[in-house]
């Protein structure tokens, strides 16, 4: 019974139903995670670009040199952050997201406006269950 109980409980948890959970939001729409979901913040590219362009001089040549230094000193971590941020924006667009926050399950079901990811997933799972 002790071994069967955790497995039985897992069957009823929202995470057990959802194979792929994506949260699409921005810094103005906080949310409560359930763990394991992918996060796409649509304003992340802008925040990274703001870091790169912070306190640049008015001289275009100096500004260009500083940005190049910042890009090279950021190394692969910065490249990974930029690529991931822009890939997230592309993925949200391809999923057809129209409002924030959005919780997407299995690239098919979407709940808009629910900041609690577990609650959004539970709503989707309730909808997916066979109706009597």
Language model features: what each stretch is:
Residues 5-6, 16:
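Cleavable N-terminal signal peptides
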Residues 11-13:
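N-terminal signal peptide c-region/cleavage motif recognized by signal peptidases
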Residues 16-60:
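N-terminal secretory signal peptides
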Residues 28-30, 109-111, 117:
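Solvent-exposed loop/turn segments at secondary-structure junctions
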Residues 74-97:
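Thioredoxin-like thiol-disulfide oxidoreductase module
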Residues 100-111:
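A short, hydrophobic beta-strand/beta-hairpin element that forms part of a small beta-sheet core
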Residues 113-132:
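C-terminal partner/receptor-binding element of secreted or periplasmic proteins
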